C-alpha cells in the first residue's frame, strides 16, 4: 500500500519540557493505526501535530509525499479542510445548529453548493442511523448520537485521513461498539484512520498499534 502520511524525528518542547522525543512513523493508504499509552505519554500531542493542528518544535511531516509547511496557515487550513477529518472525545458541535446544519458547515466553508451539501449531509447522517434526527439540536441528542453527528461532520469533505482522539472516551459500552463499527466501515471504504485511545481492546481492532511512553514510541504491534 502507498504511504499517505510520514513523520520524521518529531519533537515537541513546551515551556522547556520535551513532550515528544524524536518520533518517526508512517501511515499507509487504507490503514487503521491506533496509538495507546498512559496519560501524559504524548499521544494526543503527537496526533495534533500529525493532524496539522499543532506544529512540531523539530521534525518533518509529509502528507501524500509533500512536506507540510507549518508556517503557512493558509495552506494548513486548506489541507485540514480538504484532506483531513477530526473526531474528538468532546464533539464540539455548534449548539444553535441542528444535526444536519452542523454537518453542512464544513462543506459550505469549502464552497460546495448548499443543495449538494444538504444532500451529502442527509446521506451521511442516514448512514450513521440518524436519518430521523436531522432537525434535532445537540441538546436533544444522546451522547452517542452527538458523537455520530461529529463523525458525519468529519467525513463531510471526504477526507483521505481521519484522526480520532479518544473518540469513545465519554460513551457507554453500547455506543463505544457502535462508534468502532462505524470507524471499521469507514476504513473498509478506503479512508485511513489514526486513533488515540487508552483502551487496549479497541486498539486490537486496528491494523497496527503504536505504544507510547514518556514521549517515545516504545512498542509496535502489526495485525495484518
From Swiss-Prot:
Cytoplasm recorded as keyword: no
One record GO biological process: transmembrane transport
The UniProt record lists the keyword Metal-binding: no
GO MF, one annotated term: ATP binding
Principal location: membrane
Subunit and partners: The complex is composed of two ATP-binding proteins (LolD) and two transmembrane proteins (LolC and LolE).
Protein's recorded name: Lipoprotein-releasing system ATP-binding protein LolD
Native species: Aquifex aeolicus (strain VF5)
Taxonomic placement: Bacteria, Pseudomonadati, Aquificota, Aquificia, Aquificales
Designated gene of the protein: lolD
Amino acid at each position: 500500500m502507498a504511504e499517505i502520511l510520514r513523520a520524521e524525528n518529531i519533537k515537541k518542547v513546551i515551556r522547556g519540557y520535551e513532550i515528544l522525543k524524536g518520533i518517526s512513523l508512517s501511515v499507509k493508504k487504507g490503514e487503521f493505526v491506533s496509538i495507546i499509552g498512559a496519560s501524559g505519554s504524548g499521544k494526543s500531542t503527537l496526533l495534533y501535530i500529525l493532524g496539522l493542528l499543532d506544529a512540531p518544535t523539530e521534525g518533518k511531516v509529509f502528507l501524500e509525499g509533500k512536506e507540510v509547511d507549518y508556517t503557512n496557515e493558509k495552506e494548513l487550513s486548506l489541507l485540514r479542510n480538504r484532506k483531513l477529518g477530526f473526531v474528538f472525545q468532546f464533539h464540539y458541535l455548534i449548539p444553535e445548529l441542528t444535526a444536519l446544519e452542523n454537518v453542512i458547515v464544513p462543506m459550505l466553508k469549502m464552497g460546495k453548493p448548499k443543495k449538494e451539501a444538504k444532500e451529502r449531509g442527509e446521506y451521511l447522517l442516514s448512514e450513521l442511523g440518524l436519518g430521523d434526527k436531522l432537525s434535532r439540536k445537540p441538546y436533544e441528542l444522546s451522547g452517542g448520537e452527538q458523537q455520530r453527528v461529529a463523525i458525519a461532520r468529519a467525513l463531510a469533505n471526504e477526507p483521505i485521513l481521519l484522526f480520532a482522539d479518544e473518540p469513545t472516551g465519554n460513551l457507554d459500552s453500547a455506543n463505544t461498539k457502535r462508534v468502532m463499527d462505524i470507524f471499521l466501515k469507514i476504513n473498509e471504504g478506503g479512508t485511513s484512520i489514526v486513533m488515540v485511545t487508552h483502551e487496549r481492546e479497541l486498539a486490537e481492532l486496528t491494523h497496527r498499534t503504536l505504544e507510547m511512553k514518556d514521549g517515545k514510541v516504545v512498542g509496535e504491534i502489526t495485525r495484518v
